[in-house]
Amino acid sequence: MNIVYNSKHYHVVEYPALGSYEVVDKHLGVAGYLQGEVAQVFGESLAQAIAEDPTHDSLDEFLGNFDFLMTQPVRVH
């Protein structure tokens, strides 16, 4: 498990052994689990976004494009 990105708005965790990502929208309180081809494309796109403009604002904007995939409520234990 690798924390790839963390801001006030989003949290992204990579699970390399599974080839998957978990993306959490902290404001909406929802998360999405990406695996397979979707995870591969997401990882490549995220790496490119980080390389082009690694500011929190630009990365949060990029991650906002994936809000529709985040459908699972986040629960705090």
Predicted regions and their residues:
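Polybasic/polar functional segments that serve as interface/processing modules
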Residues: 1-77
